[in-house]
């Protein structure tokens, strides 16, 4: 990439907009008061939401957990998908180059629909996006097929607020397999339904684009996740139908799913905890590579309101780079960032001893 473009994007990053007070009159931009300020804050002052912050007062009730209720439809469908994906791996050498490039591009866009869309924009409100970007992200999210934005955000806010309890949809204390995929193969724990149902989701209910996706999600996901990625290689450059189905669709979809799931499983079990040793989430570079920047998980749980989800800007974090590029184009704004002083103070206060300095 030309140096002058990188400089412009870097300059856009340094001009991160920061909310300095709850919005009330004054200068307006997108209906909210904010100002550009190079001195980033360390405390969460988002006016939109608070239900993604950890609630230490919630504790699991004593007694044996309820009996697991298997969802056999999900078990069968997940098994068939991964069988198709494994077969797709054997077909990659016979695929046309265009098919491999198309599948990779589809994977990246799908991943951004989760990371930049459902996660950092709609679950945590760490930045704001104008309509063209929100439209792109809602389409990309539909391509990813990991539940609609509303349901994804509700589960994720519950994961943060009730982390490592039975009210956490993918509680890592129940083991690697459960937090990775098992939670999707059984009925939700009653605590997930109870506590998740009480979360404040009014910000998403008020967003017409999110509600439109939720209303038409089934036909949308069939088109964007399965039909389109199968037909495009087959029709446009003469790829075989089986290669299109098993590589561009099954393999690509399985990779996106597992990259996201590893954030819930591996990044809660393997890695180091420089910011907070008292929580299970960890920094995992390998997860960040696959999940386009979501592997800095100890930082993210310590500072869920930081749009970068990492202390280190673009380092193994394509999602942050993407958001900064959108900011350069004027499509993303009000990106929230934690000050270096606040990060260092948190490391000193709660970080693992091996990660502290000075």
UniProtKB/Swiss-Prot annotation:
Cell location: Endoplasmic reticulum membrane; Microsome membrane
Membrane disposition: Multi-pass membrane protein
Top-level taxonomic group: Eukaryota
Gene Ontology terms, MF aspect: iron ion binding; palmitoyl-CoA 9-desaturase activity; stearoyl-CoA 9-desaturase activity
Conditions for induction: Up-regulated in liver in the absence of dietary unsaturated fatty acids. Expression in adipose tissue seems to be constitutive.
Domain description: The histidine box domains are involved in binding the catalytic metal ions.
Name of protein: Stearoyl-CoA desaturase 2
Organism: Rattus norvegicus
This protein's encoding gene: Scd2
